[in-house]
């Protein structure tokens, strides 16, 4: 019997985002450490690392209230975060391609000489390093595209979807505010300040 293959880092990230989208709830780390292994097959030991990577990439929001951190995710925000990441990676890849082309030209000029020169050796090393960097960037671009093959098209067509999602989350936020007032006795303006909720926060028409 073959050994069961573990989840890749990207699979863990995708499955953890599914928890937020499917439940539309707010979690503490200890909640995720119970739910993620049971429902998504993410090992308990890796939950904190995966969750932090999603926070770092802007896919998941985190707010500290009292002594605890609370985590939640907005569907529309995730789409825009992926779009921004793709734009950055595409820009870096484009710059890398231009540098690569310029170095190729420089090496061709260096080859005209009859003997190996120090300049040619240096250019060859730089070209090799740049080639490796370019391949890494290409791989990362593809990773983000593979995470959701239709992400670019979704972003173009997401206005209505994002509006509906935002209004659903508006419901959730109002529910969370009510819960926080009951649970912690917080005043509404303090909750708004902690969560960065603007005074004119309301449903989108």
Swiss-Prot record:
Source species taxonomy: Eukaryota, Metazoa, Chordata, Craniata, Vertebrata
Compartments reported by the entry: Nucleus
UniProt xrefs under SUPFAM superfamilies: Winged helix' DNA-binding domain (SSF46785)
GO molecular function, one term: double-stranded DNA binding
Quaternary data: Heterodimer with PSMC3IP/HOP2. MND1-PSMC3IP interacts with DMC1 and RAD51 and binds preferentially to dsDNA.
Known role: Required for proper homologous chromosome pairing and efficient cross-over and intragenic recombination during meiosis. Stimulates both DMC1- and RAD51-mediated homologous strand assimilation, which is required for the resolution of meiotic double-strand breaks.
UniProt gene name: MND1
One of the protein's GO biological processes: reciprocal meiotic recombination
Family, per entry: Belongs to the MND1 family.
Keyword annotations from UniProtKB, A to Z: Acetylation, Coiled coil, DNA recombination, DNA-binding, Meiosis, Nucleus
Keyword Coiled coil: yes
Protein name: Meiotic nuclear division protein 1 homolog
PTM annotation (N-acetylserine): residues: 2
Source organism superkingdom: Eukaryota
Keyword Kinase in annotation: no
Pfam family, one: LZ3wCH
GO cellular component: nucleus
InterPro entries: LZ3wCH, Mnd1, Mnd1_HTH, WH_DNA-bd_sf
Coiled coil: 83-173
